[in-house]
Design a protein with these regions (language model features):
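Transition-metal
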Residues: 1-143, 195, 204-225, 247, ...
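An exposed, glycine/acidic-rich loop-and-rim segment of catalytic or binding clefts
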Residues: 152-154, 160, 171-173, 179-227
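C-terminal amphipathic alpha-helical segment
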Residues: 199-271
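Short acidic-glycine-tyrosine-enriched beta hairpin
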Residues: 161-173, 187, 285-305
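Short beta-strand segments in beta-sandwich/barrel cores
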Residues: 100, 279-284, 298
Length: 330
């Protein structure tokens, strides 16, 4: 497409998003000190930061659901390379007090074979971890699909899982096709393709519906899953850059009143989110009123956002998560 034929995209200022607390039987009743939230009846296992039902909290679109906003303004939010009008990423915190089911996610091809819009590749950034915390990630080298099937049938699947110790600050990549399970002992910031397609392989006899045949079909014996070493650059630390998303730590100079936030590359702008893993910040621009980012809060930065500066209000650990379009690169 030539530059002359590109559509005119309206500017959209950054905005805060209200979190959504999602019930999970394996979650926690009390999310303090992470969030000032105590569950009424059912435990909370996930805090969705960018779910379709999350509400826009600030700006001219305050009160709308995030899903509705994506339907109404796909180009302003996602940029000129948007391939559809839906939200590309689901970002959430995960709080587990017991082992989650062993599961596997399909890739785009397999998900679409069974009528889904896309597969699910994801990553976990470890916000906190107890000593000896682990996750199950992938299969041991000598495991075959027949071993997996027999392990499901006789309750010994866990013996085939690769157990990965995790520490605060680890970025764990979980590509589609990787058998995995989150275990208790850590708090994870998950970034995933926006998809609810999960094939449950094994659930320790707890009665949840299993998808054994599809999970076996989706399983890859060898994947790229694992802890990704960070790439330290002068203006940011790249925790991961994948086909679907990038996750970066952004330093903010506390010796200055504010730091102008640059995009992660000179390519076509895309949607990104700013998450305060700790501390708080304020973003400001001549184009919009100052916007505060509280601890564990999130701000959406549309592709067509004006340039702004970030001020560290104390103890800021700033994470930027950006959508990627497969095949486009950055």
């Amino acid at each position: 497409m030539s530059t002359a034929s590109r559509p005119v995209i309206a500017e959209m200022v950054p905005f805060s998003v209200e979190p959504q607390f999602v019930d999970r039987v394996w979650g926690l009743m009390d999310l303090r000190p992470w969030y000032d939230h105590v569950a009424d009846q059912e435990p909370v296992g996930e805090v969705w930061l960018t779910g379709d039902d999350c509400k826009v909290a600030t700006g001219p679109h305050a009160g709308k659901s995030l899903g509705a906003l994506f339907q109404e303004n796909p180009l302003s939010l996602l940029g000129q390379d948007a391939v559809d009008s839906g939200s590309p990423l689901l970002i959430k915190l995960i709080f587990a007090r017991e082992k989650l089911s062993v599961q596997v996610h399909p890739d785009d091809r397999l998900a679409q074979k069974y009528g889904g819009p896309r597969g699910k590749t994801e990553c976990w950034y470890t916000l906190a971890a107890e000593p000896h915390a682990k996750v199950a990630l992938g299969l041991k080298p000598d495991v075959t699909l027949e071993t997996v099937k027999s392990g499901i049938e006789n309750g010994t699947l866990e013996e085939s899982l690769n157990l990965l110790p995790v520490r605060a600050g680890d970025l764990i990549f979980v590509d589609a096709g990787t058998v995995h399970a989150i275990w208790p002992g850590s708090v994870l910031l998950e970034t995933q393709q926006y998809s609810d397609t999960t094939y449950c392989m094994y659930d320790y006899g707890r009665g949840r519906e299993l998808h054994v045949d599809k999970s076996i079909e989706a399983t890859r014996l060898v994947t790229n899953a694992g802890i990704i070493p960070p790439a330290v650059l002068p203006d940011r630390t790249v925790l991961i850059e994948s086909a679907y998303f990038s996750v970066e730590k952004i330093p903010v100079d506390v010796s200055r009143s504010s730091t102008t936030l640059r995009r992660s590359s000179d390519s076509v702008p895309t949607l990104s989110y700013l998450f305060a893993a700790s501390g708080s910040a304020r973003i400001a621009s001549p184009s919009f009123a100052p916007l505060d980012l509280p601890e564990r809060g999130i701000i959406a930065v549309p592709a067509c956002s004006p340039v702004f500066a970030v001020q560290d209000l104390g103890g800021l650990d700033l994470i930027r998560i950006s959508a990627q379009t497969p095949g486009k690169g950055r």
